[in-house]
Structure formats: C-alpha cells, structure tokens
Amino acid sequence: MFGLGGQELVLILLIILLLFGAKKLPELARGLGRGMKEFKKAQTEIEEEFNKVVEEPPAKEKTTT
C-alpha cells in the first residue's frame, strides 16, 4: 500500500493520535470515509459517461455532391 510497511503505518497512526487526540479520531475517520465515498461516486460517474461516449456509434457523415 503506497510502499509503506507496517512500522511506517503504525508511526503515522501514532503521530495522528498525538496531533488530534483520541476524541477527534472517530470524527476524522468519518469525514475521511465520506470523502472517499464521494470520490468513488464521482469516479464511477465519470467512467460511465466515458463509456457512453466511447460506445456511441459515430455520426453518419453527410456527403455533398
């Protein structure tokens, strides 16, 4: 996961705990979860729109004589 080992993750979590305190962690995690959910939703919408555009047959060209 991003090239981080177990020790690095534990160290990062300890720093976050020291910076924000135990009382704020659930609130931070909730906000992070909501943000990730919104990001994934937007990503899915963009992928669906892209697939619609790619799968549409090309418009027929008008020929002039």
UniProtKB/Swiss-Prot annotation:
**Cleaved signal peptide residues:** none
Question: Which Gene3D superfamilies does the record cross-reference, listed alphabetically?
Answer: 1.20.5.3310
Pfam families to which the protein is assigned, alphabetical? TatA_B_E
Choose one Gene Ontology CC annotation of this protein and give it: TAT protein transport complex
Q: Does the keyword Transit peptide apply?
A: no
Per the record, the domain of life is: Bacteria
Key words of the record: Cell inner membrane, Cell membrane, Membrane, Protein transport, Translocation, Transmembrane, Transmembrane helix, Transport
User: Where does this one sit in the cell?
Assistant: Cell inner membrane
Membrane disposition:
Single-pass membrane protein
GO-annotated molecular function: protein transmembrane transporter activity
Q: An example of a Gene Ontology BP annotation on this entry?
A: protein transport by the Tat complex
Work out whether the entry's keyword set contains Cell inner membrane.
yes
Its chief place of residence is membrane
Where are the membrane-spanning stretches?
Answer: 1-21
The UniProt similarity line reads: Belongs to the TatA/E family.
Annotated function: Part of the twin-arginine translocation (Tat) system that transports large folded proteins containing a characteristic twin-arginine motif in their signal peptide across membranes. TatA could form the protein-conducting channel of the Tat system.
Concerning NCBIfam families, the annotation shows: tatAE
Its subunit composition reads: Forms a complex with TatC.
Record-given protein name:
Sec-independent protein translocase protein TatA
What is the organism of origin for this protein? Chlorobium phaeobacteroides (strain DSM 266 / SMG 266 / 2430)
Q: Which gene encodes it?
A: tatA
